[in-house]
Amino acid sequence: MASESTILSNAENLKKFLRLPQNGQLIAEYIWIDSEGGTRSKSRTLPEKESQYLPEELPIWNFDGSSTGQAPGENSDVYLKPVAVFPDPFRGSPNILVLSECWNADGTPNKFNHRHEAAKLMEAHADQVPWFGLEQEYTLLDINDRPYGWPRNGFPAPQGPYYCGVGTGKVVQRDIVEAHYKCCLYAGVKISGTNAEVMPAQWEFQVGPCDGIEMGDHLWLARFLLHRVSEEFGAKVSFDPKPIPGDWNGAGLHTNFSTENMRKEGGMKYIEDAIKKLEARHKEHIAVYGEGNDKRLTGRHETGSIDSFTYGVANRGASIRIPRECGAKGYGYFEDRRPASNADPYQITGIIMETCFGAVSE
């Protein structure tokens, strides 16, 4: 008997079981966000339909919130309300992934359900036609929480050759990145690209443009898929905004934003108006832009300082960057570079809408 079990999934052995018929039934994997900003999931059997289930056609389910930090033990049931449905790239058709909101037994949204408030803001300001695009940076770690490919008792060569790198010694775990990309495409996630990042073992994928609340839904589903894919390769995914102290880049969740008026000729006026409003609420935004962001927003490594608000054209050291092309045309979008990689996309997109267009009354 082996002294320790493998950390890898045995995907090859699993294949023959995945090919077995399901006799008119499907597996629905319900996914939710826990108290630590991670994803959890569990499965249930449902009758197969000719067309894909809509969220409102799926049953509300529940889980033990005392085991996820979302409810006390004496009143532990938390309800899962389906909000978005995706094809399952792991089990294949007709199986589905069901992104769900968390609700308390008394009919109120769970305190960690940030989607509910964001959805109200998106609905109230739908006439602005908001588009978002998020750039999710992350770091791949081994089982001992060391970045993949790093020397066990030392450090790799300084940053420089790794960003968008090609070749051994410049990138690691590209197989995870490729598998994740294909899973997102299969599931219908609006993934728009990927690249190796500045620090070795750090990668980025982009999701968007997405309309309104769809942004948070697709980013969270993409995060879930990344964790699931990484299981197959024995890797851990870290969204820590500064996983390695010192002269190494941190990890962010750069947020690109525009409205219909910003995308039209003369839209720079609306972009500048929005930036002024963002400046006035800098501290409020920082409060929901991720844990540990002070270690990343130092004014170095392509970041602005957490203590000040700046903006500029093509300036990656600013809080807000206006792309040079947009500056030249006079319309387009802007990039909020402040959010950390572990921030909740619902909170990011929600507070941007609130700051630019006003809060929603209860």
UniProtKB/Swiss-Prot annotation:
It is an enzyme of class 6 (ligase). It is found in: Cytoplasm. InterPro entries: Gln_synt_N (IPR008147), Gln_synt_N_sf (IPR036651), Gln_synth/guanido_kin_cat_dom (IPR014746), Gln_synth_cat_dom (IPR008146), Gln_synth_gly_rich_site (IPR027303), Gln_synth_N_conserv_site (IPR027302), Glutamine_Synthetase (IPR050292). It comes from the Eukaryota. Keywords: ATP-binding, Cytoplasm, Ligase, Nucleotide-binding. Homooctamer. Belongs to the glutamine synthetase family. This is Glutamine synthetase. It comes from Neurospora crassa (strain ATCC 24698 / 74-OR23-1A / CBS 708.71 / DSM 1257 / FGSC 987).
